């Protein structure tokens, strides 16, 4: 078992074993984010679902109002005039069969892959390469589309795709430690609303089990998710 560093143990000692009010939890994580770089803020949500059943799977997108603070490299598989359209809209990579061939060889210098529907039969053959990395385009995630300009701009502006892992936990980055606490709270609230709005039809019993927020190098802080749900956007 890996040892906890003295620094992390020291920081964790400042945190009480209880669920904090949302803004208080965010402020506490920000205070402990003292690495030499701008740490990423992360939310980890344990849900009462069993993703091995198709009606208990969660996969969707969220458009964070204040963005993520991270740049996203986008690749687009399309054809014809849409290759130039994708590049003009801000995609770092765009191509036809040539890009599919590069990806099949493991050349994946991108964070997100978008495809037009006519190219999905070719992209689908890349499942062994894209699947384990969570990069396979999906209509529900907005990454299979003919409106490339809108999709690219949305993802560049902070739209994120996320899913529950096989244990029913959602892991989402929701900003940077340099963001104001209010901006981070707005992002976290939007994430909570998205998770609630996309509750799987087969979910049984208590849907939310726990919510923790943390930063890249900091300790986790439990959040009172009921208090988060009670917050009205704009309040």
UniProtKB/Swiss-Prot annotation:
Signal peptide as annotated in the record: none
GO annotations of cellular component type: large ribosomal subunit
Pfam families: Ribosomal_L1
GO MF assignments: rRNA binding; structural constituent of ribosome; tRNA binding
InterPro entries per the UniProt record, alphabetical: Ribosom_uL1_bac-type, Ribosomal_uL1, Ribosomal_uL1-like, Ribosomal_uL1/biogenesis, Ribosomal_uL1_3-a/b-sand, Ribosomal_uL1_CS
PROSITE patterns: RIBOSOMAL_L1
Domain of life: Bacteria
Keywords: Repressor, Ribonucleoprotein, Ribosomal protein, RNA-binding, rRNA-binding, Translation regulation, tRNA-binding
GO biological process, one term: translation
Subunit details: Part of the 50S ribosomal subunit.
Alphabetized HAMAP family for the sequence: Ribosomal_uL1_B
Role summary: Binds directly to 23S rRNA. The L1 stalk is quite mobile in the ribosome, and is involved in E site tRNA release. Protein L1 is also a translational repressor protein, it controls the translation of the L11 operon by binding to its mRNA.
Family stated for the protein in its record: Belongs to the universal ribosomal protein uL1 family.
Record protein name field: Large ribosomal subunit protein uL1
